[in-house]
Amino acid sequence: MHDANIRVAIAGAGGRMGRQLIQAALALEGVQLGAALEREGSSLLGSDAGELAGAGKTGVTVQSSLDAIKDDFDVFIDFTRPEGTLNHLAFCRQHGKGMVIGTTGFDEAGKQAIRDAAADIAIVFAANFSVGVNVMLKLLEKAAKVMGDYTDIEIIEAHHRHKVDAPSGTALAMGEAIAHALDKDLKDCAVYSREGHTGERVPGTIGFATVRAGDIVGEHTAMFADIGERLEITHKASSRMTFANGAVRSALWLSGKESGLFDMRDVLDLNNL
C-alpha cells in the first residue's frame, strides 16, 4: 500500500450507505476517495461521486467495472450484498487490494471465502463498524462471564423496513460474544423464533427477537434477566454516518498490513482491555 493517503473505492456508491461512505472518505485526513462503483446499467454511472453524495465535485466518476478502477484504489469498502461482495473479494485477492467488509448475511461458505482470502490480503470484516457497538460487545463479554451462567439471556434488535437479513449481523455478533465468554458455540444454544406452545424457557439458551419497521437505523439490546433484577445493555444508532466513519477509519488502519483477517475490535485495540 502507498505511504501517502490511502485511496479507497466505495461499492454501491449510489445507495444510502454508499453515499455516506463517500462523505466519510472525503472528510477523514489521510484518506483519499479513489473510485466509486455501481452496478452495470445504473442511471448513476458517469456521475461525480462527490456530487452524488452531496459533498461537492471530486472528479471521481461512478464506474461499473472493477478493471477500470483497479489502479485507482488501495482498499475496497463494501457494504452491499453477499454475492456481490464475494465477487469483489475475488478481484481484490487477485490484485492485492485490502478490503473493509460491512456486508452482512453471509452463509458459512461465504465466511470461509473471506477467511481464505485473508491469507493473501488484509481484510477488516465486522458486523458493525460503530465504535459504540464494539465497546458494547466487549461489555457483553464481561457481563456474560459474571452473570451468564444463571440469567436468561435475550437479544432484541430493530432495523428499518428495507433490511433483508435477520437477525442482524450485529445481533449475531452479540450472541457470539456472549456464547464465547460462556465457552459455548452459538449454534448450539441460539433460539431464533418462538411460536405456539413452546413450553418453558430452556436454561442456557440465548434468545433472539427481531423488529423491522419504518426508518430505524439500528437498535440492539442484550438482556440478562434473573428473578428480581435484570441488566440491559443497549446501543442505538441515529445515523449511518457512525458506521461509515468506522469503516473509513478501518481502511486507514489497514495501511501497511499485507494480509490477515481483522475486525473492528482490532482497529480500536479493544482486545487488550
UniProtKB/Swiss-Prot annotation:
Name of one Pfam family that matches: DapB_N
Binding site for (S)-2,3,4,5-tetrahydrodipicolinate: H160, G169, T170
Alphabetically ordered keywords of this record: Amino-acid biosynthesis, Cytoplasm, Diaminopimelate biosynthesis, Lysine biosynthesis, NAD, NADP, Oxidoreductase
Pathway it works in: Amino-acid biosynthesis; L-lysine biosynthesis via DAP pathway; (S)-tetrahydrodipicolinate from L-aspartate: step 4/4
Localization (cell): Cytoplasm
Catalytic activity annotation: (S)-2,3,4,5-tetrahydrodipicolinate + NAD(+) + H2O = (2S,4S)-4-hydroxy-2,3,4,5-tetrahydrodipicolinate + NADH + H(+); (S)-2,3,4,5-tetrahydrodipicolinate + NADP(+) + H2O = (2S,4S)-4-hydroxy-2,3,4,5-tetrahydrodipicolinate + NADPH + H(+)
Domain of life of the organism encoding this protein: Bacteria
InterPro entries the UniProt entry points to: DapB_C, DapB_N, DapB_N_CS, DHDPR_bac, NAD(P)-bd_dom_sf
The EC number(s) this enzyme carries: 1.17.1.8
GO MF assignments: 4-hydroxy-tetrahydrodipicolinate reductase; NAD binding; NADP binding; oxidoreductase activity, acting on CH or CH2 groups, NAD or NADP as acceptor
CDD domains according to UniProt: DHDPR_N (cd02274)
Residues that coordinate or bind NAD(+): G12, A13, G14, G15, R16, M17, E38, G102, T103, T104, A126, A127, N128, F129
UniProt xrefs under PROSITE patterns: DAPB
GO CC terms of this entry: cytosol
Enzyme class: oxidoreductase
Residues reported in the UniProt entry to bind NADP(+): R39
Example GO BP: diaminopimelate biosynthetic process
Family assignment from sequence similarity: Belongs to the DapB family.
Function according to Swiss-Prot or TrEMBL: Catalyzes the conversion of 4-hydroxy-tetrahydrodipicolinate (HTPA) to tetrahydrodipicolinate.
Annotated protein name in UniProt: 4-hydroxy-tetrahydrodipicolinate reductase
Gene: dapB
